[in-house]
Design a protein with these regions (language model features):
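Short coil/linker segments at helix-helix boundaries
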Residues: 203-229, 283-290, 308-326
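Bacterial N-terminal signal peptides
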Residues: 7-19
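Short Trp-Ser/Thr-centered turn/loop motifs at beta-strand boundaries
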Residues: 110-119
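Boundary at the C-terminal end of the N-terminal hydrophobic targeting segment
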Residues: 21-23, 27
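N-terminal secretory signal peptides that target proteins for export/translocation
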Residues: 1-5
């Protein structure tokens, strides 16, 4: 086969996947791979999506440049995934092949064959091929122009005067607001947004620096610059004698500069049926600190980011001492007043892990014993939430009862905060922490393996709207956040980060270490195209990127380096699967659930990819 013909067939195969990504599953045999590629020494598995009548007998790994067959194997049957349609999956395992290069997988079933998209095998592949784009994405999301100028003199929400809060990053493809967090009224689903971006950039900078690879040097320079840009914004959002403003809203159909304002905490989503509809709001928050964040609504991670920024090798627009001052003042305020800022006035697991990260970073920046004591207390509170009930052993308890913690974007943050804490804890507390982390991650691994799951997608323990507790692939549609639900690429990337952070700590258990590395890689493979829809969800990488449409308009276009929301449960089946079933199918503004880019997805992806791995 000539290279030109081979490339035409590969292109046609991928283009077919692009055009049909919203179909439930294709009838023809498909070869699903990580469309960027695989680490040289890591497991390398392609998945074959086949009809029940298909019985692929052989797979071959073909060198893209020459057409030479370099590896041959027999696919292993993996079976169906319950309620994901009638597709049967087969595994093509070529893990033992470790020669860097560009390759294609070919699957044969009698006279029928199928080709994968081309992919690469190399060391530090995702760092090399994707990290730069993600950093550029954040720079492209910086507030600028007329909107940024408006943000430099926004009216104070609770009195006369104006405040300069320019800077920050626009939240999503179609949202030019700038948010610390959202979903306040849900109690359990506050997501970490702009502060998370700042923290992951700076923590990722430290991580890459510690890996001591000159190939990363320019990434480090740009991550430091971007992280300090975020820290500068957090300083501007800091309220004197208080916490931080939570949000800058960019409301209105035309998103005009003059409409921008400090955001109300009590935001509620409306699923629109017309483009000119606006989101609903509950009665506005009231009180002297009504527009300020709690630990769980962005304050804890903002403090962590500012404390970490104060340890960087250079200043941003503000000196490093100012970063630390803002962090210490906000921490002192929230230690005294956090419950007053909560919608239900009751702390839960989100407050624990956000405050733990804040205290840990403050101790790292200052070595003040008061911060280590605060971190010890929050770590103890968090670890006490490991709970066993019925068949569910060592899950995180979200409240003071038995409600499981599950989260659409930050599921890995309890472990991330504990592993970060373990670096400063006493020997006794470190031992206790590593035991808790292992128990938690063993639960995650067991839940993921509980059912047939050839993709290794991170499953979760959830609480349905009727109170039933069960395991599931995807975030339920009937939680306190309803009608808000969307794809979970941030969730699985946060779990990949948690697993990669934890893995080096368990050198005495190679099997557990390997399981964590596999688990992390499986989540990244899913994002990069090894999923049932053959769609890379990192814009500009791989194939099958789906466009974000707003009522049939493409005016909001996702940026290269962005990670979109991703795959969800079925529209009418919590155990089903759906992707890109928007306005054209539902008659509602549902496209964002799958196709919209969002800061937390890229933030967690960047951090996971920055971490050392095998």
């Amino acid at each position: 086969m000539t290279r030109l013909l081979r490339h035409f067939l590969v292109f046609a195969s991928c283009a077919l996947g692009i055009s049909m990504a919203s179909a439930q599953m294709r009838a023809q045999m498909r070869v699903l791979v990580d469309q960027v590629g695989y680490e040289t020494k890591a497991p390398k598995v392609g998945l074959i999506s086949a009809a029940p009548t298909d019985h692929p007998a052989q797979f071959t790994l073909i060198e893209d440049e020459t057409g030479k067959v370099v590896f041959t194997g027999a696919p292993q049957a993996e079976g169906k995934v319950d309620r994901w349609g009638d597709r049967v999956y087969w595994k093509a395992d070529f893990s033992s092949f470790q020669t860097p290069g560009h390759y294609i997988l070919r699957i044969a079933d009698g006279d029928t064959s199928a080709l994968s998209c081309a992919f690469q095998i190399d060391d530090n592949l995702l760092e090399r091929k994707t990290l730069s784009n993600v950093i550029f994405y954040f720079k492209g999301q910086r507030a600028s122009g007329a909107l940024d100028r408006a943000d430099s003199h926004l009216k104070l929400p609770d009195g006369p005067g104006a405040v300069d809060v320019h800077g920050g990053w626009y939240d999503a493809t179609g949202d030019y607001g700038i948010h610390f967090s959202q979903l306040n009224l849900t109690s359990y689903f506050n997501n970490q947004q702009v502060p998370l971006v700042a923290w992951t950039l700076l923590a990722g900078y430290d991580t890459l620096k510690a890996r001591n690879d000159d190939n990363f040097s320019e990434y480090e320079r740009r991550m430091l610059d971007e992280g300090l840009f975020g820290a500068d914004f957090l300083v501007r959002m800091k309220r004197p004698q208080g916490s931080f403003f939570q949000s800058i809203d960019g409301p209105g159909v035309k998103k005009l500069p003059q409409d921008r304002k400090i955001g109300d905490l009590n935001w509620k989503l409306t699923v629109k049926t017309k483009a000119d509809q606006l989101n609903e709001k509950e009665p506005p928050a009231e009180g002297p600190h009504s527009h300020e964040v709690s630990f769980r609504s962005g304050g804890g991670v903002a403090i962590a980011a500012l404390a970490l920024a104060s340890t960087m090798p250079e200043d941003g627009d503000f000196p490093r001492a100012r970063y630390l001052q803002a962090a210490e003042e906000a921490f002192a305020f929230l230690q005294a007043h956090n419950r007053e800022l909560l919608n239900d006035h009751a702390e839960n697991i989100l407050d624990d892990y956000c405050a733990l990260l804040a205290a840990t970073e403050l101790y790292g920046a200052t070595h003040k014993q008061s911060y280590l004591l605060a971190a010890d207390q929050r770590a103890d509170s968090l670890m006490a939430r490991l709970t066993t009930r019925d068949a569910f052993r060592d899950y995180w308890r979200a409240d003071n009862g038995t409600r499981p913690f599950f989260h659409p974007s930050d599921a890995g943050l309890p472990v991330v905060s504990l592993v970060r804490y373990a670096t400063v804890a006493s020997a006794a507390n470190r031992k206790k922490t590593l035991d808790a982390v292992k128990r938690s991650l063993e639960f995650e691994l067991a839940t993921t393996r509980e059912v047939n799951n050839p993709f290794g997608y991170a499953r979760q323990l959830v609480r349905m709207g009727n109170g039933d507790v069960r395991t599931a692939f995807f975030f339920p549609h009937d939680t306190e956040a309803a009608p808000w639900w969307q794809g979970e690429n941030a969730r699985i990337a946060s779990l990949a980060a948690a697993a990669r952070m934890a893995a080096p700590l368990y050198g005495d258990d190679p099997s557990f270490q390997s399981a964590l590395q596999n688990y992390a890689e499986d989540q990244l493979h899913w994002i990069l195209g090894r999923n049932p829809f053959d769609s890379s969800m990192l814009i500009g990488s791989g194939h099958g990127n789906i466009p974000y449409m707003f009522f049939r308009s493409y005016k909001y276009t996702s940026a290269p380096g962005a990670v979109i929301n991703g795959i969800t449960a079925g529209l009418n089946d919590e155990d089903g699967i759906a992707y890109n079933e928007g306005f054209a199918q539902t008659g509602k503004d549902d496209d964002w659930r799958w196709a919209e880019e969002w800061l937390p997805h890229a933030a967690w992806y960047l951090y996971a990819v920055s971490l050392p791995h095998r």
